[in-house]
Design a protein with these regions (language model features):
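Conserved short loop/turn motifs at secondary-structure junctions
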Residues: 19-24, 42, 46-54, 181-185
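Short acidic, low-complexity intrinsically disordered linear motifs used
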Residues: 253-275
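Solvent-exposed loop and beta-edge segments used for protein-protein assembly and interaction
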Residues: 29, 173-175, 261
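Internal maturation/activation junctions in enzymes
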Residues: 9-14, 34-82
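Conserved phosphate/anionic-ligand binding catalytic regions in large, soluble enzymes, centered on
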Residues: 24-39, 73-100, 268
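Catalytic alpha/beta core of large soluble enzyme barrels
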Residues: 1-14, 21-24, 82, 91-257
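Short beta-strand-initiation
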Residues: 72-75, 176, 262
Length: 275
């Protein structure tokens, strides 16, 4: 499908150089997600052979279809994306990241002009006005439970995260894997040394302090098992009638889906549809 899509290079409002570059490279993004949920692919040793074999299949498939279409083969195909949206839909660990906690509240922000926002409010999904934009953004909260024996954010060190990233950078990705590393206070010196030693390949990596601090309406908020049960009892919904969306969706309004990105104490509403 991606190879077919790479033929769509008629950019009406961009310079010819962009069209030429796109036709020359035809970059694809065949990504893996749920990596930390997999018993083999989450390991730094056992996964290498499998990753190289899967990468070869992706490359050969693109080559075969490109030859059939009479277009150049893509110069880069495989990657690891953050996968925030897909992972939520299929209940998988996000990209190459561990799951947040055994039990947590996941908040999602919606533009009040978005029909989906109004639909969820009407269906009784727990919601409250966004603290920063109370007149235009609504925050929905969902109680989440990780699977048994899931790898959690607190189970692995920063260096273990980086070493797994390196395996994927060398044995799977033609692009660079995207990852955000949670770093405990006592780990920063070791992390700095690792980056220095791997400077030639270290890109696509972000670092955030590993913190148990939870602020109001944070995207992920740790809760205990009892709180999870209470949330489900009071606000849990399993009988949402999605056919009613047609009553709200009268026009194309795809720019309304938004999620809050928070780093260094600053939060920004990000348009999910732009990615």
């Amino acid at each position: 499908l991606g190879t077919l899509q790479s033929t769509l290079t008629d950019f009406k409002y961009l310079r010819k150089i962009w069209k030429d570059n796109t036709e020359e490279e035809r970059l694809l993004g065949v990504s893996l997600t749920g990596i930390m949920d997999h018993s083999v692919l989450s390991k730094t040793v056992d996964s290498r052979v499998w990753l190289e074999e899967m990468r070869e299949v992706a490359i050969e498939t693109n080559k075969t279809i490109a030859n059939t279409l009479g277009i150049p083969q893509s110069t880069a195909i495989t990657c690891v994306k953050p996968s925030g949206t897909v992972s939520q839909l299929v209940d998988a660990a996000s990209g190459i990241h561990a799951r947040h906690n055994d039990y947590y509240i996941r908040t999602v922000r919606g533009d009040n002009k978005d029909p989906l926002t109004q639909f969820l409010i009407g269906e009784g999904i727990y919601n409250e006005p966004d603290m920063m934009k109370p007149d235009s953004v609504t925050v929905f909260s969902f109680p989440m439970q990780s699977p048994d024996r899931a790898v959690l954010r607190g189970d692995i060190t920063a260096i273990e995260q980086l070493e797994l990233w390196k395996v994927y950078a060398l044995h799977w990705c033609e692009h660079k894997p995207s990852v955000t590393i949670s770093v405990r206070e006592e780990e920063w010196m070791d992390v700095g040394a690792w980056v220095y030693e791997n400077f030639d390949i270290a890109s696509g990596v972000s670092f955030l302090p590993h913190s148990n601090h939870t602020y109001q309406q944070a995207p992920y908020q740790d809760i205990e098992y009892e709180e999870y049960l209470e949330w489900n009892m009071r606000y849990g919904r399993t009988n949402i009638d999605w056919t009613k969306m047609t009553e709200f969706e009268k026009e194309d309004n795809t720019t309304g889906s938004r999620e809050l990105a928070c780093t260094a104490g600053v939060c920004e509403v990000v348009d999910l549809s732009a990615g």
